[in-house]
Amino acid sequence: MFTGIVTDIGTVEATEKQGDLHVRVSTAYETGGIDLGASISCSGVCLTVVDKAPGWVAFDVSGETISRTAEGMWTSGRKLNLERALRLGDELGGHIVTGHVDGIGTVRSIEEIGGSHHIVIAAGPELAPYVAPKGSITVDGVSLTVNAVRDTDAGVEFDLNIIPHTAAVTTFGALEAGQAVNLEIDVLARYLQRMEALRGKA
């Protein structure tokens, strides 16, 4: 479990196909304090540490995970938003994030307004019921508040405001229009939608 508050930006240093894809990621984390088997969110994807050394950690990424995450994410040189798993007593600064990607979004536009970045992201119809104004959503592992929502023929578009600090401490500072991003809906929205669906069958 995570909070969507990024604590490091890692870089994919190397990949190797070993059945699953073995991915080594550089990090500023003190890896001596990271146990093998620990969970780390990598741009919104919960992965298990399978190897480590000073300056890097490694993960095995399944074909299923690769197929459900943003295109180009698992390539050398790619920057990743990193967050270690939430521990009892930690501050919950964002919202509850599971590290399970619900869908892929596409950055439609980025506009700088007063130092902040106004970003529009498009997603498919399967996510539309779960995106609400002033609700929470996780984009590439970052907990964000939705400013506005528009239903479209292709699904849904929503607006985000990225303040300078968030852009500086995440990969959003280098985000480009047309780029694919990992999306995770608010777990509370997921449960509420399920309850509403069951109520309709009663």
Language model features with spans:
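Conserved loop->alpha-helix
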Residues: 1-202
